[in-house]
């Protein structure tokens, strides 16, 4: 049986924890959003369910009509993902929602069609209009509370806080220079500045005494004689002191006690006073009490409203409803579970489920935040400001949440329409049902817009499996609600200590997006709040346990974490008394007794792609970044080869990318060919499972996707085994390039500036040959002038040009094509305006002859040549124009189809009955099963299941059965659910087939009669100008392909395959490539594959030992001989095997020349760029170069007749034709443009002819 090859390693023991599923971030999130496979009553209040529950019920303005949401139901996809790509349609399911409408006429329930929802494929992608797309996860500022500080121009530090909700108005509070706190709402600083005390009163704390009680500890002090004065003078009163009989006020809450006040109180026989402990006249709260213009709840509300909405009448009702709407109405203000979690964590509130479900602001939150702010001001050591770049304050919005927000805005739009329709409905003429007032357009258009146009919905990078995998694990700080790349500063982009194990510090693009687009680290997961977690081993009493704890960045702050490479003995205790550890973002040597956790693996720091770089620890980070990014650009080769020196992640990356086919259960291979593998499962060999292989499909990047079986008939397969290789994989391992024998030496100057010299042998062996597939599409439409026709009968085209076209005008498969060849012949009716005047005259005289047509065939564009490998034709069938024979044939076809469908249904029912029997027969019912609608007891508790009872259950649907949760019934529910889904899928497939037979391809765009897609495959060999790279950021361009005989050779006559420049190593500091070369040489000689995981790879000494064991020079250097002269080079040269990739920047796609082509209308100069068939611009610097040589006539020619002198161009053409040799240049058009521009500025510039 085939197994992935074992790799030799120096690692002492394997990782304690396996990598999680690498595309879990996508799949888990979307699964949670749709909750497919769950019954309506079992669905949690998350995702789509949560949105419906939030928006509904909708009430009419007079509350006489109520529309309630009951449940939603998802259909099954009409086509498979591959078929959707082929047809250019969206892979989606129908969404039907059950509503209940209550009005004066009674209660009505109805299921309403709400459009379609795209669903995710098994690989974590979406297919939108035939293109595979990925929704990138977004990193944004977490809702919750943040405390900050800024320096005032006078040098004072001003503290502030911000309460950021998930949806709604921001609330900010900031100290001013006088130690007063002001509240700002929605960041509109100047206009909406409100004293914090006024805001507190507006929340309902009306009296000064209430406010003081909230902020200070209150103590009762006795006042018996003047001796007590010394303890009381200067203290702050916590309550008003008044004489109850005469209502005379001796002191107000918040006032500072003076000797005179105390005397008056003593005289009035007041014996006890309430004092605010720790308060003094400089305390911000006391200062604000004195400053506050309001003294009651009502006055504060009005003042708040006046400042918020200046110019509007401040009535109490308006003011109250405004503050309620701003912060206390869950439809307008929502902290979200995350915001509440962050707020409670920071302010020390309880974290129970009930508290976390409160999504609006509470009075306690504002008071708690102000208390914390004052503690910061007072210099309390336990209070700290927040770092907004810390991952505790940044969270990830995955695909499910992003789409949920879109659905929310779509349904909110729909809510307004529904309410309007309810109010405008005429009950006298018609009865109201849900379907009449619900418009599905709102939801459908929002989803279409998001998947098609959002910055986070991206065309999947499918160059190779790694590119695909990385794209799904990408994190972006851009997009709606995120940052703007122009305004993002250095701090946001920088690597932060909290990124350890969560976000890869290496993998990010070079250029304007650096640091804003990042990648998830290899072991990282995203928790329910959207924070990134990373796993650690727990250390108890100095023993490193195998228990794993996933921690968010804020929890980790309190821990002391040892490195995964710290030495342990056989009892899992630290060998040394001290080890390197991290705590609060600092690395230091810690006493092992203080360590609380330990890293799971050294590679948890980096992402998957970075983890594929061997000897990463010896590379400079900048080059490692390039190495990571360039692996994603490697083109899948025709002949794949796994790296000799790997890191051990190759197999896992290939498996999770979805490029290879993996067995889903144990079994035996029953049948194998190039298109499918059939496996008979171990538990039931009759239920054979077929794995269809992808053959020669075009990827998003134009590369070829082809899967090859790896197993043979009779092989025993275990679940998880690789049964077929895909693009850029070899024996189930990632294989992006080739192991090449290289020499680091200069060679006749050809490898100057990182250029690469390769041997012709590599070309002969097809080592770097790749296949590209281009798709060309042509549609025939029904136009105003008549139907377009796809035909072989094209006007004015010779027979030899049509040689490769079939009878129907479509090119035959296998034809070799080059630029300009016709792929599909098409003629379209000519309009009257396109006729020449003499033609029109002849028509007027001789009458209308058959309407003329013009050639609109699809031809091969310049720069493309290859072999036609596939043709797909989609066409509509006109039911009225079918002949009798066609109708008879159709009827026979439909009959066969129906027969097949019935057979499949009966097989499915038999299978289901067998499974039910195996589960239930002769078992006791653990609880009663009740019919949901009729309330009949179908199975009594304790009944022994017999055949009759099982048949009774078999006829019921899952929705109608009420079963208490228990192990047996949970399995039963799963069986029922699978059976119903399979039945539904069979039915949809049958209906789709019937529709196809009757109407053809009905999902073509409106007005399209026929659509043809032609796929041309071209073989690209390695050529001069192609870009190549290693895995260490060592990139270069092929400068020369040298005959094998001329290449340097070793003493044994073996020629080197590639020559690299040694000067590319020292300044770039990527020594990993040199170590890889040595280890590759030793491993190749020994005939083994090795793995050297990041940070725990082969030490230098072990590589030298291996070299000596294999009889190779200890320093890895050998003498080479010049292939041209046979002489030995003076010095020894580093030679060995290095893994080199061919990148998708091929010279064939970039090189371009123009003879004739389009001109710009304004300047009359040729356009620029390959896509526009543009020319090369002879710019000012090039002019200077020619001026330096004084070539006046050549310059005049270049700047006039060869460029934009319109009349001169024509004259020179004529003179060339006639064979004359004269150059008369006129005025360049660009000079006329300059004159016109100056005239536009009001300057009258005219060229004047001056007589010599």
From Swiss-Prot:
Organism lineage: Bacteria, Pseudomonadati, Chlamydiota, Chlamydiia, Chlamydiales
This protein's name: DNA-directed RNA polymerase subunit beta
PANTHER family according to UniProt: DNA-DIRECTED RNA POLYMERASE I SUBUNIT 2
Any GO BP: DNA-templated transcription
Signal peptide: none
Function: DNA-dependent RNA polymerase catalyzes the transcription of DNA into RNA using the four ribonucleoside triphosphates as substrates.
Keywords (A to Z) from UniProt: DNA-directed RNA polymerase, Nucleotidyltransferase, Transcription, Transferase
Quaternary structure and partners: The RNAP catalytic core consists of 2 alpha, 1 beta, 1 beta' and 1 omega subunit. When a sigma factor is associated with the core the holoenzyme is formed, which can initiate transcription.
GO cellular component: DNA-directed RNA polymerase complex
Alphabetical list of CDD domains matching this protein: RNA_pol_B_RPB2 (cd00653)
Family: Belongs to the RNA polymerase beta chain family.
A GO term for molecular function: DNA-directed RNA polymerase activity
HAMAP family on file: RNApol_bact_RpoB (MF_01321)
Reaction equation(s) it catalyzes: RNA(n) + a ribonucleoside 5'-triphosphate = RNA(n+1) + diphosphate
Gene responsible for this protein: rpoB
